[in-house]
């Protein structure tokens, strides 16, 4: 039993100065002048902010990369890195490499993180097609494997499998149905590149079918402004989009400025429902840049701590209210 006294509590709405009683790993009470029982650990939290753990929906928990050959494969994430970033829930996924990495390995890491005390989920699939799976079936992976929430796929990227709209529709239908059977959200996380089609295939699939728009959830949506505008259109249709956080070092954006506040303000100006926009770290994945011929120029490892730094930057640089910054 733990009693935190006089914390400035966000849930994520601002509740003000409160006491919080935790028993058996669960919050049992939030209130004023709470008392703990015999053996209760009391923590003086005066002057501290107490928030829910962050949810990072894009973490390469087993590592990513590999686009510059085998020595550029990135290492798996460590629990300590996740916790230092204030993250208590992760969605683990694969990336470009679905040959030297597997759903089996991903699922084992996700289970290990759960055993270590955080909440962890996974996606089957990677960039490629047909999707890599545990059971041999996307539908069975989602319906029967507790940790698997949906599918990963790449679109509009030079590393994407360039599937047809009909194939995208089939995957959307399978994921939708499997999610219903398994009692899960059932969604496809779409790695978006800088390709000229942008979200065109998704809009075609939605126009031709009755698949719910929330089934297709694109990420890396700030890759260029044209793609972001497509994302705002999707969000206004009821879909969800995810923006990858900038890289930060010691709390400072590597590129010298933080574009996230302007992106979010643009969404507000366009009357986009802001609860349909998230941001994530892409932690332990690789950041990379390519020349005009498609040759790799640079590659590095993305820090899972970028999400916490991004949230802080929204407040300190963007002037966002802390309670709002927590919601993304």
Q: Predicted regions: what is each one?
A:
Residues 1-2, 9-51:
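Histidine-rich, glycine-flanked metal-binding segment
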Residues 36-48, 137-142, 260-273:
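Short amphipathic alpha-helices and their capping/turn segments at secondary-structure boundaries
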Residues 269-328:
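His/Asp/Glu-enriched, well-ordered alpha-helical/loop segment
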Residues 96-108, 116-212, 225:
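Buried, small/hydrophobic-residue-enriched core segments of structured protein domains
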Residues 159, 167, 173-288, 296-297:
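Active-site core of metal-dependent hydrolases
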């Amino acid at each position: 039993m733990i009693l935190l006294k006089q914390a400035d509590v966000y849930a994520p709405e601002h509740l003000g100065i409160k006491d919080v009683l935790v028993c058996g790993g669960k919050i049992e009470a939030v209130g004023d002048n709470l008392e703990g029982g015999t053996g209760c650990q009391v923590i003086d939290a005066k002057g501290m902010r107490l928030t829910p753990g962050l949810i990072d929906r894009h973490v390469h928990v087993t590592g990513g990369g590999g686009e510059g050959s085998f020595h550029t494969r990135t290492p798996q994430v460590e629990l300590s890195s996740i916790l230092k970033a204030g993250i208590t829930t992760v969605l683990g996924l694969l990336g470009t490499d679905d040959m030297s990495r597997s759903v089996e390995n991903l699922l084992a890491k996700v289970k290990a993180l759960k055993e270590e005390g955080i909440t962890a989920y996974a996606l089957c699939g990677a960039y490629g097609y047909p999707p890599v799976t545990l059971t041999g079936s996307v539908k069975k992976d989602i319906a029967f494997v507790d940790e698997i929430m949906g599918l990963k796929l790449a679109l509009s990227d030079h590393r994407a499998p360039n599937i047809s709209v009909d194939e995208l529709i089939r995957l959307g239908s399978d994921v939708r149905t499997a999610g219903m059977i398994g009692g899960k959200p059932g969604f496809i996380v779409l790695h978006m590149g800088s390709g000229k089609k942008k979200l065109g295939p998704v809009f075609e699939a939605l126009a031709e079918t009755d698949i719910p728009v929330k089934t297709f959830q694109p990420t890396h949506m700030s890759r260029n402004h044209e793609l972001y505008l497509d994302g705002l259109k999707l969000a206004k249709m009821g879909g969800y989009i995810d923006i990858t956080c900038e890289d930060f070092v010691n709390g400072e954006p590597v590129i010298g400025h933080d574009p996230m506040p302007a992106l979010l303000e643009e969404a507000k100006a366009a009357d986009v429902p802001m609860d349909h926009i998230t941001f994530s770290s892409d932690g332990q994945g690789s950041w990379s840049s390519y020349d005009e011929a498609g040759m790799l120029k640079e590659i590095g490892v993305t820090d899972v701590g970028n999400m916490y730094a991004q949230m802080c930057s929204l407040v300190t640089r963007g002037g966002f209210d802390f309670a709002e910054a927590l919601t993304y």
